[in-house]
Amino acid sequence: MTIRYIDHVLIAVPDLDAAAEQYRKLGFHVTAGGTHPDRGTANRLVVLEDGYLELIAVHDRTAAWPELVRHLDQNGPGLFTFAFGSSDLDADVARFRSRNAEGITSLQAEEPQEGELVTSGAKRRGWRSSRVSGGERVNPFLIQHDSTDEEKRLKLFGDHPPQSHPLGYGRIERLEVVFPSLEEGEAYFRDGYGLSRVGEQSVCPSRQGDRIFFPLAQGQLEVIAPNSPDSPLNDFVSLRKYGVRGVVLTVPDLDGAASYLAGQGIRITRSPISGAVQIDPADALGARLVLVKE
C-alpha cells in the first residue's frame, strides 16, 4: 500500500483575503497561494511540518469542483475534505479498482488527473490526483505531487521563502472523521482505502462516541461515531452524513498558545484533562481546530 500520510486538509472559504487575515490571527503563516487554471478555484496555504491546510475559494462556479460549490452553498465555510498522499498513485488507483471489482467496496478511484497551481509570480507546482466516487458524500481523494520532501515544501511556499508560524504550529497529529456507526467507518477506510486499524475500540466520554484509530506514516485518523442520542456528533451526522469534523494540530506550548489566541480576541476552550486548546469554529471560518502539545 502506498497511501502513506495525510497530505492536506481543505477548508472551504467564501473570500480568500478575509480567510487569510483571520488565520493569521490564529497564529498561522499564510502563503500568497495561487490559482488552479481551468478549475475555477484559488487558494492560500498553511504549510506545516508534514502536510498543509488549504484555504480554498471558488471564483468560477461553472468550472469548480461541483461538490465544493455545493458544500459552500449548503454548509457555508468550514472543513470540506482531505487528501491522502500517495507515493505511487497508479498503483493505489489499481488497488482501489480491484477492491471495487471484487465487490469489497462501492467506492471507486477515478482516472488520475493532472493538476497545477500558478502563483502570482508565475511559479508552477504540479501534481496528479484521483478523486474517489461512490458513497453518499464527498470522499477523501488521493494525490501525488511532482516533488517530495524539502523540494515539495519549498514549492508549497510559492513565491516567498519558507516562514515559521508565530504560534509555532508543527504537524497534523490526527483528523477526526465522523460516521453514523463505527462499523460503517471502519469498513469505509479498510475496504475502500485499504487501511488497517490498530488497537481496540474505545470511548470518548466528552463527545459521547465510540472510536478506533487508523495510523499512517504521518498522522492518524480517528474514526468516531455517536453512541448516545445526546452526543454532539449527531448534529454533524444529520447535516453531513460522514466526513472530517476536526483537525488536531501540534504546538510546543499549550499555555502559550492559549495566551496568544486570547490576545488576538480568539475564543477558546481548554480540556480539563489534557489541557488541549480548541478554537471556537466561529473564529476559524467554521473549521474545528484542536491544539495539543507536540
Regions found by a protein language model. Name each.
Residues 1-6, 11-30, 48-199, 205-294:
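Glyoxalase I/VOC metalloenzyme domain signal
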Residues 31-35:
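Membrane-interface helix-loop junction between the first two transmembrane segments
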Residues 44-46:
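Short beta-strand scaffold segments in enzyme catalytic cores
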